[in-house]
Amino acid sequence: MTAQAMIVDGTDLDAQASALRTVSPRLHRCLDPVRLTTTASAALDRSVRDFGPETTGGRGGAYVRAQTTQLAARADGIRALLGLFGPAVRHPDAVVLDLLGGNGLVRQVNDLFGLIDAEILTCDGAPHMVSAAWAQGSPAVLQQAQHLVVRDCSVDGVLLAYGTHHIPAAERAGVAREARRVLRAGGVFVLHDFDVGSPMDTWFAEVVDPYSATGHRYPHLTRTVIGDHLAAAGFRGYRVTEIVDPYVTTAPTREEARLRLGRYLTDMYGLVRAEAELGPDGASAWAARRAEEIFRFTTQDGVPARPRFERTSDGQWAYLVPRPALVGTAVK
């Protein structure tokens, strides 16, 4: 359901609602006019700085560049997450909210691979991300995950992924309550994060925090905390499990695939201090090497997981860097 690329002001909720009415009446019907007005002042969150443009001290420009140049780098994890919505989104008018949607990556991957038929509304608290999403054909609305501008019982799925730890710990339970509020009966909430002490937690602490301009000191969730939030929100049926959510880059040679992974990581996390120290190519090689050292673990089934190369069906080399992630799935 690829939409036309548009220039829409990421700070202007009225402009976003108007554009949404034009490109997708289905998504526009999900918006709550009262909340659009009363929640506008609370729409911005702390990720405004992290995911703003570099001119304001953020890493938003590099983040968007990473997703644009390597659109499929996180496709395996996105495929697994969207698959968890199951029958809830298998009807002609299904809608999924992507609460931390950034520049619309989940929708764009879904459009590319045809993973689910539901229409995805990208949501984010950073105006720069909302503008970027519209510019790349992903309809988007500026809103905090804990203060949605969406009607009660109006959507079939809610995804909270790839940034859950950015939400202040005291407000995370409120996100689960908001997700349940906007879901129809039988709708599904999928909550994803990287466990405390996981390789991703180590990556943020040892690489992103010291080598990015924004730092990265956000407490991650645990299996128990995810379950507690889902139960407290009133979900009667839920489960928490682990998936492998890899980075994957492809190229004609093994070394090029590896360096593309390093470039992707350098852009994705805004590792500007590594670039200043080592230069762009040196920073890419360094980031790939650190990923090889950090992303080594044993899955919940007891299987060792390590970075590896694979041949693709068209003769390219794929470089896979596995990441364990926790996922809570709850049905209203």
Describe each model-derived feature in a short phrase:
Residues 2-92, 105-109, 129, 190-213:
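Conserved class I S-adenosyl-L-methionine
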Residues 5-36, 237-332:
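Conserved Class I S-adenosyl-L-methionine
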Residues 97-147:
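Class I SAM-dependent methyltransferase SAM/SAH-binding core
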Residues 159:
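A conserved beta-strand element that flanks and buttresses the S-adenosyl-L-methionine
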Residues 162-166:
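Short catalytic micro-motifs in class I SAM-dependent methyltransferases
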Residues 173-188:
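A short glycine-rich, Lys/Arg-flanked "PGG" loop and its adjoining helix->strand segment in the class I
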Residues 218-234:
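Short alpha-helix
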